[in-house]
UniProtKB/Swiss-Prot annotation:
UniProt EC number: 2.7.7.87
Domain of life of the native organism: Bacteria
Keyword Calcium listed: no
Lineage of the species this protein comes from: Bacteria, Pseudomonadati, Pseudomonadota, Gammaproteobacteria, Alteromonadales
InterPro entries per the UniProt record, alphabetical: DHBP_synth_RibB-like_a/b_dom, Sua5-like_dom, TC-AMP_synthase, TC-AMP_synthase_SUA5
GO biological-process terms attached to the record: regulation of translational fidelity; tRNA threonylcarbamoyladenosine modification
Gene name, Swiss-Prot/TrEMBL: tsaC
Catalytic activity: L-threonine + hydrogencarbonate + ATP = L-threonylcarbamoyladenylate + diphosphate + H2O
Protein name in the entry: Threonylcarbamoyl-AMP synthase
PANTHER family listed in its UniProt record: SUA5, THREONYLCARBAMOYL-AMP SYNTHASE
Family to which this protein belongs: Belongs to the SUA5 family. TsaC subfamily.
Entry GO CC: cytoplasm
Amino acid sequence: MSDQSTIAAAITCLAQGEVILYPTEAVYGLGCDPDNQQAVERLLAIKQRPVEKGLILIADNYGQLLKYVDDAKIPMDKRADIFSSWPNAITWVMPAAKNTPKWLTGQYDTIAVRVTNHPTVKRLCQEFGKPLVSTSANLSGQNTVLSIAEAKSQFTEQIGYYVDEPLGGNTQPSTIKDAMNGKVFRG
């Protein structure tokens, strides 16, 4: 478990609109404040990822995601599948709330969300009081970095803080499913 100074340093960077690198269930992720357009644009520039692709939000609990999700549109018969799958490395693509910014959804009217079971990410989201943008720590189309040293070599001074904690132990990135019909996009 991360010590408080590590979490505090990461939270300070997030609050200042910086991008952090942190461990997730399977890979290192790049993250920032989802409500800060400049921070999200900075993250996309670092990753060389087009905004049209949309991003994932990772949270400590579903309540943190409600601002971004049109919860009323999620079919009643899919809710048990969704909520029983969390916390875990399962990302669900849900209808986006009307006010969810396009810098998060890209070209879509949906938002990809996950409630994590990774202790460091849970603490980050708890202390920050909201979800984080979560995208794999790599340049778009390249392999994900496998260590903090590799991340520092690839991203140099572009990252505000490197949360040097262990990965969660999963060997594959999160499964991504459609909350409306259960279809697997990535499994």
